[in-house]
């Protein structure tokens, strides 16, 4: 896995990959069509952010590369990599409890706020890739 040089792309398995944490200058790509929605990505070494139809989906500080992102009514899955540990925030259903799994191990349950934001840390510095699964309880 590596940075997504084209900033965002659709994978053969109909998932999204995005983010290039190797960039020194901010880059963005808007109006990327995927499954009837329009996506926008902003990414560089300090932050990676994804929006769907103008609404928040994902943000990491510092920047990361995300592969095979899928989201449905029950949760979200993706793989993430970056040069150092990252704080990741995703948009889920508001005021709902989710369990977060990193590389198959539960990190516990977290309840989203009224805006639906869910935040967690991922230890990326000494890892090749971290598999993330967020599951509705």
Could you say what each language-model-derived stretch is?
Residues 2-67:
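Catalytic cores of secreted or luminal carbohydrate-active enzymes
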Residues 9-11, 16, 71, 81, ...:
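A generic structural signal for short, non-catalytic loop/turn and secondary-structure boundary residues
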Residues 27, 31-42, 49, 86-88, ...:
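C-terminal beta-strand-rich structural cap/linker in extracellular carbohydrate-active enzymes
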Residues 76-78, 100, 132:
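Hydrophobic residues positioned within well-ordered beta-strands of beta-sheet architectures
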Residues 79-96:
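Surface-exposed beta-strand/loop patches in extracellular or lumenal glycoproteins
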Residues 101-105:
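Short strand-turn-strand beta-turns centered on an Asx-Gly dipeptide
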């Amino acid at each position: 896995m590596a940075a997504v040089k084209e900033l965002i792309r659709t994978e053969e398995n109909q998932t999204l990959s995005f983010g290039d944490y190797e960039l020194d200058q901010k880059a963005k790509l808007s109006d990327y069509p995927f499954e009837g929605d329009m996506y926008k990505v902003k990414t560089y070494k300090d932050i990676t952010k994804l929006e769907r139809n103008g609404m928040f989906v994902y943000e990491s500080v510092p920047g990361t590369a995300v592969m095979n992102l899928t989201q449905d009514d029950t949760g979200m899955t993706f793989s993430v990599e970056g040069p150092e540990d990252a704080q990741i925030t995703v948009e889920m259903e508001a005021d709902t409890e989710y369990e977060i799994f990193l590389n198959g191990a539960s990190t516990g349950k977290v309840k989203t706020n009224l805006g639906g934001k869910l935040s967690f840390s991922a230890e990326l510095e000494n890892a090749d890739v971290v598999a993330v699964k967020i599951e509705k309880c």
